[in-house]
Design a protein with these regions (language model features):
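Surface-exposed interaction regions that form or flank ligand-binding interfaces
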Residues: 1, 8-10, 21-26, 32-125
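Active-site-adjacent structural patch at catalytic or cofactor/ligand-binding sites
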Residues: 18
Length: 125
């Protein structure tokens, strides 16, 4: 799983990419999910929880920001409804386009980018 941060006027998108193949089942509150594919069944840690851990770390660095979580599945078929933050890669543009209200002004946007680029621990006002 790889995480990416997209800083925009609409919020700070925190994307966790899941490059899994097969059918994924479970529930959004389960600690582990089941991945079935090619005759093999395996368990993975719930990527929604992993995404939340990444947001928690960013909150410590950036302070209170409008974080928008998303877990993006590149190849898997989702068997269950994992909620609106579980997105197949083909739905990603639609996911982004759903955010239309500006929540971060230009100055704070630049500050967020500077903090992430410099690796400083300055909290935002």
């Amino acid at each position: 799983q790889i995480s990416h941060v997209v800083v925009s006027p609409y919020g700070v998108f925190v994307l966790t990419l899941c490059d899994l193949r097969g059918k994924i089942s479970g529930h959004r509150d389960d600690q582990e999910w089941i991945v079935k594919g090619r005759g093999v069944s395996d368990t993975i840690l719930n990527p929604l929880w992993e995404n939340r851990k990444h947001i928690n770390a960013l909150e410590k660095k950036l302070g209170s920001q409008p974080f928008i979580p998303a877990v993006v599945f590149t190849h898997a078929k989702l068997i269950n409804d994992f909620g609106p933050i579980a997105v197949c890669v083909g739905q990603l543009q639609k996911f982004f386009m759903g955010y239309t209200r500006r929540l971060i002004d230009h100055d704070d946007l630049e500050l967020v980018v500077d903090i992430l680029n410099e690796g400083t621990d300055r909290p935002l006002p």
